Amino acid sequence: MSNSSIEKIDNKYNFKIEYKLINNKELLKSRLSEIPKSSGCYLFKDIDNNLLYIGKSKKLRSRVSSYFNNYSDLTPRLSLMVRQITEIEIIVTDSEYEALNLESNLIKTNKPYFNILLKDDKKYPYLCITWSEKYPRIFITRRRRNRNNLDRYYGPYVDVGLLRRTLFTIKKIFPLRQRPRPVYKDRTCLNYSIGRCPGVCQEVISSDDYKKIMQQVSMIFQGRNDDLEIFLQKKMLQFSNDLDYENAAKIRDQISGLKLLTESQKISIPDSSINRDIFGIVSEKNVASIQIFQMRSGKLIGRIGYSQKLNNEDENHILQKILEEHYMNVEAVEIPSEILIQYNLPKQATIEDWLTELRKKKVKILIPKRNKKHETVEMVLKNAKLELDRILNGIQDNESSIEDLAQILELSEQPKRIEGYDISHIQGSDPVASQVVFIDGIPSKQHYRKYKIKDPNVFVGHSDDFASIYEVIHRRFKKWSRFKKSGGDFSILNDKTNSKLDNELLSDWPDLIMIDGGKGQLNAAIKALNELNLEEEVTICSLAKKNEEIFIPGFTKSLDTDENQKGVLLLRRVRDEAHRFALSFHRDKRSKRMNRSQLSQISGLGPSRIRELLEYFKSIDAIRIASKEDLSKVKGLGKNSVNDIYEYFNEL
């Protein structure tokens, strides 16, 4: 690769840059001057052509150059990203608005690693209705897959418990499809007999009539309970006038159930006849708490909370980022006509235009100073402050736990980054390991890693946790052994303020690693570190489940601790999370193996076809209920294969 090359195709520029240019500021400045000054998007890529980050700017050259001007001004996360950049792709647009729209679409499609603003926040659930299917399903999911455009997602919802209860109640009020696939081949099940299902599996009800029921259900998730109640009242009156008292009674029961459901939906605000979202942000001690309240037809149907470090950014810049990312992840029809915030955003007019284009109707961003709207914003800010207090109290608790752990292990420095390792298998089958990471006492899920155990001595019927731990620790720290052999100075890792420190090293080096297990597991990890000549650099301990005993190198007995000490409780959280993550990975791996095993019994299906099937349908259950038309959409499946798969599952 040359030092730099610019290739222009229409409005797209490819700008390649060698890693060594990062440290040659004069040459780098010259290359960056070739970037256009106009508005557009920039895409950062690494040496393997993986997308690292997608951004937008009104002035591309100055924005891109700002990443390389002064590394000391960058956060550790951004510094780590910049050091991986080997190619910058530029896409020029006619306006800042077009750049925002393009950025949104590119991020949705590519999901770059460094674009996810809220990595540590849990994935909030959505409710999906599969309108693309003959008999639509309704279910809760945390993953918005690229399904058919006809399918509809509602949400996200912060309270999954409430969402589950709501869906359970809806299925009691309305006769809906209860199962992903039929129980019997030629008759209905008990749900049909008791009126819980209209006989979808045997097509007792037509597709059109069933979709009418689903349209009524969808009104609930649009916050249109009152409209639905009026509709049902008219329907009940019509049945009554026709002397069809049985169906009138069914509608009456639906109305009663709907009223109970409506009463359970949080709070009601009389001022809110218009659908609106209300954003509020408060900050303290470099931590911001953001709350989003979703009002639909005067009712609060959803509430979402985020937390974010300020990192020298103003609250309004953080709020703008949150707002942009939030609306990148919702259906266009879920964008309300009004958005209330506490003060102006840096690019407010541009964002209004972008949201209006997405929604196909006017969207207003308002900063109310008085009346009911202002009171609503104040209510959201009050909730954000309560959440911030909870977060700060948690940080304080974590700090005292880390301090106590440092005293227990007699560490010279408090462990900022703690890694936990665990092994999971069933009698040697599908052996896997997990690496979880806690930073400042909080799980950092973007740093989690999964390992498939490759040791040939670990197989079905012969498990060896010691060999597995040895392998994982050896693989994890092998690059550090190379770093030491090449003359790397480990002493700088203890100086967190060293401006010369490579942030990639800093972000990846643990202050403490914890092995789930006793003395044997600890010795296996120590053996790996000894072979890598890293035994002096890595601080390590193990935590045994029996009596929560802590073992450290050089001691045959466990440390004298109280299992309810704050430091021990922190280690237990790390250990339990490592166990959960390893078990989850093991179950997933075992499930995939069993799915492949079942599909391999079908004539003509090789590994590549099986992989295509599972990637398309995601599960064996989805393949089992798929029609021939659905199966034929899978890449590479011929007519004979489609028939073989369909007949295999329909003859079981």
Swiss-Prot record:
Domain GIY-YIG span(s) in chain numbering: 37-116
Q: Which residues form the UVR domain?
A: 226-261
Q: Which GO terms describe its cellular component?
A: cytoplasm; excinuclease repair complex
Q: Name one GO biological process term.
A: nucleotide-excision repair
One matching Pfam family is: UvrC_RNaseH
GO molecular function term, any single one: excinuclease ABC activity
Kindly indicate whether the keyword RNA-binding belongs to this entry. Answer: no
Q: Where in the cell is it found?
A: Cytoplasm
Coarse class of the protein's main subcellular location: cytoplasm
InterPro entries (UniProt xref): GIY-YIG_endonuc, GIY-YIG_endonuc_sf, GIY-YIG_UvrC_Cho, Hlx-hairpin-Hlx_DNA-bd_motif, RuvA_2-like, UVR_dom, UVR_dom_sf, UvrABC_protein_C
Q: Which UniProt keywords apply?
A: Cytoplasm, DNA damage, DNA excision, DNA repair, Excision nuclease, SOS response
PROSITE patterns named in the record: GIY_YIG, UVR, UVRC
Record text on subunit structure and interactions: Interacts with UvrB in an incision complex.
Q: What does this protein do?
A: The UvrABC repair system catalyzes the recognition and processing of DNA lesions. UvrC both incises the 5' and 3' sides of the lesion. The N-terminal half is responsible for the 3' incision and the C-terminal half is responsible for the 5' incision.
Q: Which family does it belong to?
A: Belongs to the UvrC family.
Q: By what name is this protein known?
A: UvrABC system protein C
Species of provenance: Prochlorococcus marinus (strain MIT 9312)
Q: Which taxonomic lineage does the organism of this UniProt entry have?
A: Bacteria, Bacillati, Cyanobacteriota, Cyanophyceae, Synechococcales
Q: By which gene is this protein encoded?
A: uvrC
